[in-house]
Amino acid sequence: MWPQPYLPPHPMMLEESRQNKLAAAKKKLKEYQQRKSPGIPAGAKTKKKKTDSSPETTTSGGGHSPGDSQYQELAVALESSSVTISQLNENIESLKQQKKQVEHQLEEAKKTNNEIHKAQMERLETINILTLEKADLKTTLYHTKRAARHFEEESKDLAGRLQYSLQRIQELERALCAVSTQQQEEDRSSSCREAVLHRRLQQTIKERALLNAHVTQVTESLKQVQLERDEYAKHIKGERARWQERMWKMSVEARTLKEEKKRDIHRIQELERSLSELKNQMAKPPSLAPPAVTSVVEQLQDEAKHLRQEVEGLEGKLQSQVENNQALSLLSKEQKQRLQEQEEMLREQEVQRVREQERLCEQNERLREQQKTLQEQGERLRKQEQRLRKQEERLRKEEERLQKQEKRLWDQEERLWKKEERLQKQEERLALSQNHKLDKQLAEPQCSFEDLNNEKKSALQLEQQVKELQEKLDEEHLEAASQQNQQLETQLSLVALPGEGDGGQHLDSEEEEAPRPTPNIPEDLESREATSSFMDLPKEKADGTEQVERRELGFVQPSGVTDGMRESFTVYESQGAVPNTRHQEMEDVIRLAQKEEEMKVKLLELQELVLPLVGNHEGHGKFLIAAQNPADEPTPGAPAPQELGAAGEQDDFYEVSLDNNVEPAPGAAREGSPHDNPTVQQIVQLSPVMQDT
């Protein structure tokens, strides 16, 4: 929390102390008048002759006694004092109202300071949220880099395993390298990555279509080969059936030939037996009919020859048939071997086709897996791009909100500057009017008007001091808000897209103070200590104003150029150092206010020392002479009371009026001039000097 500014004492306490001091001054004045009244009837006449040359003051020719004239003067003085007391009460009431207004303004200033402090706490919370979001962004960037490295490793593995798709894998590596190296340019690289992935997907789809076409072509060729194989097998089966039928026929013919051969051999054997019988019969003596026998023998021999010829023919046929059978068996063996070889070739072709089909299926599986991995990578990249876009949108919204807030602060600052200018113009007009009134009132001899003007001056100066403190606090808060906005903009420029410039500039809240005229030093001060204190106090006031200006410059000047690459804890330390410096500056301001209060206490003590001077008879003549000089013929070196009043009104520090606690002289209302009473002359002469101190 901000330290509360040191407030002056309560106005009711000041009023009570003033009333008490006023009553004590009245008592002392009455006692002084009672002591001086019985023994100075003639002295009063001489003093009246010295101070004024009016015919009313001479009592030599009058019919009244000196005691009666003194009593009349006391009555007139009491009446004038009652009138001035009533006027002072009215002035006190008006000052009370003004003080209440000032207190109300102070409460409003406190409320505005609390609101500004709440706004600063909200800004600190937003800074914390932004730092947390920055840490989340760093973690996401780290994970994306790790994912990119993982993708590179996977792409290298795929490049080692998939020689057939080397070119596409190299494109994938380039795409992954582009993802890892160009993450700060998501808007441009996202479209490029999508185009590359789309192109690669199109390429894989085309290759898959080509492979599917190749597979269909191979399957069609395989089906055609299978059909050819089936036709060839049918043809071989038909030829085999024909050869088997032919072999069966040849075997049947061979069997019939063997049977015929057996029959022929059996007939030949029978003929040989019959021939042997005939030979035996021929060897016997011829019978009675030899011609018949010879004819029979000849016939049998002819038949035997014929049978031998037939047997030889059958043997040749059988031999040729055997040779044909051997040739057919060789042909059948050769055909069987050729068929076996063709079947082996067909089996090998089938195995090769099956292997090729398996290889194509494996390649299709690898392509499907690769396409699946590419789709997964594309999905991950899309999700990552969506997250980054959401984060960018959130950062843009936060930046827009900060810009709007900064714009509101600028508008508020402009309104404050305009309000301050209006207040300065009003203060200048009030100062001119007050100076004009003071000139008129100083021309008049009544002390009540001087008291009223001094009270108004003190109230105006109090209001001016409160306004200055309020303006300083507003400038502090605005400067701190501007510095925090600049730090936020530097952090956002590091996180957001490159190319954005720094958002804010330092607020220049230095006030150009109006030149303050130094009060004129009166030459009629006889005490060296009074003159030295009178000369030192303006220097102290100037030193105080210089300190306040240095504090204001310390609030305005930046603590240093913050580095955008610092870690978040250094940012918190730099942000925490600003409130500490503000606390120190506020403590210095409070210390200055305490010093001013001590000066006011010293002025009150000097006010208490004024009244004992009234009883000093030796200093009475000096103060009387000092009162006559500014009223009748002012010295050229001594300043007029108007100048002193105007100079006291333009000072920035608190001033306490000393004329409110002194009762006016009894003859002031009657005569209309301060020359009739020496007490009035003393207080009138000392009041501007004490106001300057």
UniProtKB/Swiss-Prot annotation:
Keywords, in A-Z order: Coiled coil
Signal peptide residues on this chain, from the entry's feature table: none
Compositionally biased region (Pro residues): 1-11
An example Gene Ontology biological process: Golgi organization
Coiled coil (residue ranges): 77-611
Domain of life assignment: Eukaryota
Any Pfam family hit: GOLGA2L5
Ranges where the record places region Disordered: 1-72, 497-551, 629-650, 660-679
Gene Ontology cellular component annotations, sorted alphabetically: cis-Golgi network; Golgi cis cisterna; Golgi cisterna membrane
Composition-biased stretches (Basic and acidic residues): 537-551
InterPro entries, A to Z: GOLGA_cons_dom, Golgin_A
Protein family per UniProt: Belongs to the GOLGA6 family.
UniProt-recorded name of the protein: Golgin subfamily A member 6B
Source organism of this protein record: Homo sapiens
